């Protein structure tokens, strides 16, 4: 039997506010456990929540960015369940009247474009964190995360493969960074998702029984987890068994999912309006203000890179996939608009490779955008070859000296005296009679031998293109 995969995602975006959504406690990551949890976060008797308006504004920014319906009046509800890292015994969330209604995101896979519909996006508070490996027989609770504002973005079950799910998640990840509502740090849990997965016979409209994979914080893990879960469900159904509706956890080391608990239904949470919080009223003036302050969005920037800068769709897509990467590239162009393609190649090539190797963000790159732009200029004006430029790049990375300083101190400037270059070429030809004969018999590959010898004699300080042209003239 042929099966169809059905995937819906719930993406949890930590909003980058300075204080929590219902208290004045700070939201900095990595602080001493329970040092950023106040009486409200601890759920102590007699305390009342106070809404952080900045969290509301950031949620609206997302809604406007995806052209979604903004609910002018929305309310907070209590989601009741017991868990050790939820001290109040309930989570403040939004059920019937979320801040963001229906919207959509467009993804591209290969040459295919697909629209993924968004059901809703609602504000809620994050829970604390249970730490199971700190003590042998006990679980530690850190409530620093409790109360951090979350925007939960819920998609329709519109995705049909793991690759579509990853493309959608990456699109949201890029967008929330562009509009500055989240830092997107998946390692620190600022951006994570739950995947609801089911399968059904191809052509059937009714959805199958779903399993929910919780708290996935990596694009790679998301793809692997979905693929494993789809295979698991297929195996169960093809053996004549039934899939159980449950919550599962992905084990990235074993590359498998395992059961956590049976999946709760909405009624199990006994939602009801929070009596301590007034409804949120959103005015037309506020919506207009948010629209006016919205920056250039990723798709708009990509289009501009293609239309105005002449980049390919692929290059523009890579460069705009991270706001910081696109910003770096545009700073390079401020002094190097004549070398757009060369700048793009170096950002996507040498720079990205070095950043990945050393596992650092582009914001912390030891080579600044103006510094790399200068290096590109030295390739463009034939001061150094591309090969030499790669060596200069490594010296720049380690020393933080400028390209010009390194070229001067190390004597890397290309030879420009054509008379001297011709003498060296003639010397190589005179000492390579066998190779000359092979070339004249039609072996063009032997040119690499000559160029290698010339590079060796000049210490790589000649322009390979010029050498190639001169060499051909001398040999013919």
UniProtKB/Swiss-Prot annotation:
From the UniProt record, list the coiled-coil ranges: none
Q: Does the keyword Protein biosynthesis apply?
A: yes
GO molecular function annotations of the record: asparaginyl-tRNA synthase (glutamine-hydrolyzing) activity; ATP binding; glutaminyl-tRNA synthase (glutamine-hydrolyzing) activity
Q: Cite the SUPFAM superfamilies for this sequence.
A: GatB/YqeY motif (SSF89095), Glutamine synthetase/guanido kinase (SSF55931)
Q: What is its EC number?
A: 6.3.5.-
User: Sorted alphabetically, which keywords does the UniProt record give?
Assistant: ATP-binding, Ligase, Nucleotide-binding, Protein biosynthesis
Q: What protein family is recorded? A: Belongs to the GatB/GatE family. GatB subfamily.
**NCBIfam families the record matches:** gatB, PRK05477.1-2, PRK05477.1-4, PRK05477.1-5
Q: Which PANTHER family match?
A: GLUTAMYL-TRNA GLN AMIDOTRANSFERASE SUBUNIT B MITOCHONDRIAL AND PROKARYOTIC PET112-RELATED, GLUTAMYL-TRNA(GLN) AMIDOTRANSFERASE SUBUNIT B, MITOCHONDRIAL
Describe the subunit structure.
Heterotrimer of A, B and C subunits.
Q: What is the name of this protein?
A: Aspartyl/glutamyl-tRNA(Asn/Gln) amidotransferase subunit B
Look up and give the organism this protein is from.
Vesicomyosocius okutanii subsp. Calyptogena okutanii (strain HA)
């Amino acid at each position: 039997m042929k099966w169809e995969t059905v995937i819906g995602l719930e993406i949890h975006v930590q909003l980058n506010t300075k204080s929590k959504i219902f208290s004045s406690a700070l939201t900095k990551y990595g602080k001493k456990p329970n040092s950023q949890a106040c009486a409200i976060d601890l759920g102590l008797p007699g305390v009342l929540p106070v809404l952080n308006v900045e969290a509301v504004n950031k949620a609206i920014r997302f809604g406007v960015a995806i052209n979604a319906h903004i609910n002018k009046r929305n309310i907070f509800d209590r989601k009741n369940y017991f868990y050790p890292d939820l001290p109040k015994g309930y989570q403040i969330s939004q059920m019937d009247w979320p801040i963001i209604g229906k919207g959509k995101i467009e993804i591209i896979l290969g040459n295919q474009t697909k629209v993924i519909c968004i059901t809703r996006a609602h504000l809620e508070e994050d829970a604390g964190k249970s730490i199971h490996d700190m003590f042998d027989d006990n679980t530690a609770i850190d409530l620093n995360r409790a109360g951090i504002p979350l925007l939960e973005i819920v998609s329709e079950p519109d995705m049909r493969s793991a690759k579509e799910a990853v493309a959608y998640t990456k699109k949201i990840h890029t967008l929330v960074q562009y509009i500055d509502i989240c830092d997107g740090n998946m390692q620190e849990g600022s951006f994570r998702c739950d995947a609801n997965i089911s399968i059904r016979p191809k052509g059937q409209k009714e959805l199958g029984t779903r399993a929910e994979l919780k708290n996935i914080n990596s694009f790679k893990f998301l793809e692997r987890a979905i693929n494993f879960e789809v295979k698991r469900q297929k195996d169960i159904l093809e053996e004549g068994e039934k899939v159980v509706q449950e919550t599962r956890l992905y084990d990235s080391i074993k590359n498998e999912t395992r059961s956590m608990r049976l999946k709760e239904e909405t009624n199990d949470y006994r939602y009801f309006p929070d009596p301590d919080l007034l409804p949120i009223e959103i005015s037309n003036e506020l919506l207009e203000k948010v629209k006016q302050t919205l920056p250039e969005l990723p798709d708009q920037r990509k289009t501009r890179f293609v239309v105005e800068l002449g980049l390919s769709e692929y290059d523009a897509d890579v460069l705009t996939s991270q706001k910081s990467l696109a910003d770096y590239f545009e700073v390079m162009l401020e002094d190097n608009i004549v070398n757009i393609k060369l700048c793009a190649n170096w950002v996507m090539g040498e720079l990205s490779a070095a950043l990945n190797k050393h596992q650092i963000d582009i914001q912390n790159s030891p080579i600044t955008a103006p510094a790399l732009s200068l290096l590109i200029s030295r390739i463009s004006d034939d001061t150094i070859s591309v090969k030499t430029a790669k060596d200069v790049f490594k010296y720049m990375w380690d020393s933080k000296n400028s390209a010009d300083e390194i070229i001067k101190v190390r004597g890397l400037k290309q030879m420009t005296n054509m008379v001297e270059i011709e003498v060296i070429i003639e010397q190589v030809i005179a000492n390579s009679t066998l190779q000359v004969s092979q070339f004249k018999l039609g072996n063009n590959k032997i040119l690499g031998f000559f160029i290698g010898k010339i590079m060796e004699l000049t210490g790589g300080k000649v322009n390979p293109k010029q050498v190639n042209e001169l060499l051909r003239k001398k040999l013919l």
